[in-house]
A protein has these predicted regions:
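ATP-binding N-terminal substructure of ATP-dependent carboxylate-amine bond-forming enzymes
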Residues: 1-107, 376
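Peripheral (often C-terminal) accessory segments that flank ATP-dependent C-N-forming ligase machineries
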Residues: 5, 291-385
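Structural motif corresponding to alpha-helix initiation and N-cap regions
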Residues: 54-58, 80, 128, 158, ...
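A conserved helix-loop-beta module that forms one wall/lid of the active-site cleft
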Residues: 89, 95-152, 158
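Internal nucleotide-binding/catalytic subdomain
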Residues: 151-258
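Active-site "cap" helix and flanking loop/linker of ATP-utilizing ligase/carboxylase catalytic domains
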Residues: 230-251, 257, 267-320
Length: 385
């Protein structure tokens, strides 16, 4: 064996996050081996060494990871028992003892409370009566499996609780009640951490959600009090260290109307709120995730420009939305625009790509990114049709 060859990283999950690991992996000469849920998925289009199979099957996981130095993830859904089994064969990063805090909201809330990390008031509930005792209005969440607004219900009265309990029973999970937070906006603190303990923290960003889905990210968060920015970064770094996270950790936060920071969610993988780093930071979240899981020195997280705006391209109608055919207008109008498409077909509300616009003027960056995303979505240019 040639010791100069980089070790192979196994990646579980065929979505766009795995896809976006491929470019920095190629630049660093790091081979990737992918387990995708189906042929033709986003990551399978760009990672030749891929297998189609079920991540819930341990033998499939063992076959894909055989000969790899480390395994990492596009999502948090691999069964915890399987992760423990894989640990006997290769490095699992992040490890199952860390990852369970991103998989199970009840486990996450209990651990953060033990650490004294500020969170919304919460409780596991088993009946409508317990929700009523907790108090309305509140938010009900299934403890596992929810994302992009799925598995989350706002409830204002007892008769609205049935859907949450039915979904939890069907999935075999619990229901978590959380107070309805009066927040000014949502923030995200993103860090990368290596097994040796090195940590790299990007600027805290503002995340704009629509319909439970991340629509825009502004880096850095405009007008954020410097003290709150430091607090948010310190929370992310402390959580990464206390939970022994390896790779990228995203800490989604509420900035409350009375000036506090509360932790909303954790994700232990590259995250939508970090896509701006591909073009707006010295080192992207995807490159630092690869460096971290291999315990290589981490890259600088510094911003390349005063402002970077990321806007998701959410698929519009197949008749009016654009993918490749949106390039002539978008690229001619803004030669500095950076476009990232995921190789997905159009479907209303589906994340099919994102754009990054960076520069010295925030309003200009917002206009450029929003215009481009609207053009690809088909909201512009079809008025006469």
């Amino acid at each position: 064996m040639n010791d100069a060859l980089a070790p192979t990283i196994a990646v579980i999950g065929g979505g766009q996050l795995a896809r976006m690991l491929a470019e920095p992996a190629a630049a660093l000469g790091i081979p990737l081996r992918l387990l995708a849920e189906a042929e033709g998925l986003s990551a399978a289009q760009v990672i030749p060494d891929h297998t189609v199979g079920d991540y819930r099957d341990l033998e499939t996981l063992r076959a894909v990871t055989k000969g790899c130095a480390v395994v990492t993830f596009d999502h948090e859904h691999v069964p915890t028992d399987h992760l423990h089994a894989l640990e006997a064969e290769l490095a699992v990063r992040p490890g199952p003892e860390a990852l369970v805090h991103a998989q199970d909201k009840a486990v996450m809330r209990a651990r953060l409370a033990a650490l004294g990390v500020p969170c919304p008031r919460n409780a596991v509930v088993t009946s409508t009566a317990e929700v009523t005792a907790f108090g309305y209005p509140c938010v009900l969440k299934t403890t596992r499996g929810g994302y992009d607004g799925k598995g989350v219900w706002r409830v204002d009265a007892a008769e609205q609780c049935a859907d949450a309990f039915a979904a939890a029973e069907s999935a075999g999970v619990q229901v978590l009640a959380e107070e309805l937070v009066d927040f000014r906006r949502e923030l995200s603190a993103l860090v990368a951490r290596s097994p040796s303990g090195q940590v790299s923290a990007w600027p805290v960003v503002e995340s704009v959600q629509r319909g439970g889905i991340c629509a825009e990210v502004v880096a850095p968060a405009p007008g954020l009090d410097p003290g709150l920015a430091v607090q948010a970064q310190r929370i992310a770094m402390r959580v990464a260290a206390e939970l022994d996270v390896t790779g990228v950790l995203a800490v989604e936060l509420f900035e409350t109307t009375d000036g506090r920071i509360l932790v909303n969610e954790l994700a232990m993988r590259p995250h939508n709120t970090g896509h701006w780093t591909q073009d707006g930071a010295v080192t992207s979240q995807f490159e630092n995730h690869l460096r971290a899981v291999l315990d290589l020195p981490l890259g600088a997280p510094d911003a390349r420009a005063p402002w970077t705006v990321m806007v998701n391209i959410l698929g519009g109608d197949a008749e009016t939305g654009r993918l490749y055919d949106g390039y002539p207008h978008a690229l001619a109008r803004d030669p500095r625009l950076r476009v990232h498409l995921y190789g997905k077909g159009l479907r209303p509300g589906r994340k099919v790509g994102h754009v990054n616009a960076y520069g010295d003027d925030l309003d200009d960056c917002l206009e450029r990114a929003r215009h481009a995303a609207a053009w690809f979505r088909g909201d512009l240019g079809n008025e006469s049709e």
